[in-house]
Amino acid sequence: RLLLLGDILYHGPRNDLPDGYAPKEVLAMLNEMREELLCVRGNCDTEVDQMVLQFPILADYAVFFLNGRTVYATHGHNYNPQTPPPLKKGDILLNGHTHVPKWGAFGENFYLNPGSVSIPKEQSPRGYLIWDEESETPIAFRTLQGETWKTVSREELAK
């Protein structure tokens, strides 16, 4: 599965769009992959976007379970480490919104932000996060070229 954390086609008037940014091409590519996608709504996603996408994007959050841990995925404009959703000890909060990759413990929980594939900020690379529960380092931050630049171990996630 591919989890998209919002702002699927457009990133709002505050962000300059990079050269080559082509939302219609993104739309076509994502619609072809619709059976593999799970999405949450970003602060720039609208009902108009939903009209052209063939998979749901307007859920405020998604909750799923991995190896006995709850993962709460949301865009990040409402729920984030500063204003967390109701979490139990050991839960993982997964956000986008800032376009800056981050990871680490907060309180009794763990936080992950994959950054952005299209409009990264704070000199971070265009990139994404791979979550592979079968790996000794289940979290890998990668550039668009596929280069892993940061991993998070099981021990770090367990803190």
PLM feature spans:
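Binuclear metal-dependent phosphoesterase catalytic core
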Residues: 67, 107, 111-159
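Short linear motifs in intrinsically disordered
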Residues: 51-57, 92-93, 119-121, 130-133
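Conserved beta-strand segments of alpha/beta enzyme cores
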Residues: 36-38, 56, 70, 110, ...
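Internal catalytic-core helix/loop-beta-alpha segment
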Residues: 54-102
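Core catalytic region of metal-dependent phosphoesterases/phosphodiesterases
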Residues: 1-66
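Active-site neighborhood of phospho(di)ester-bond hydrolases with catalytic His/Asp-centered motifs
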Residues: 2-7, 37-43, 72-75, 92-97, ...
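Active-site environment of divalent metal-dependent phosphoester hydrolases
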Residues: 10-12, 43-50, 78-84, 94-106, ...
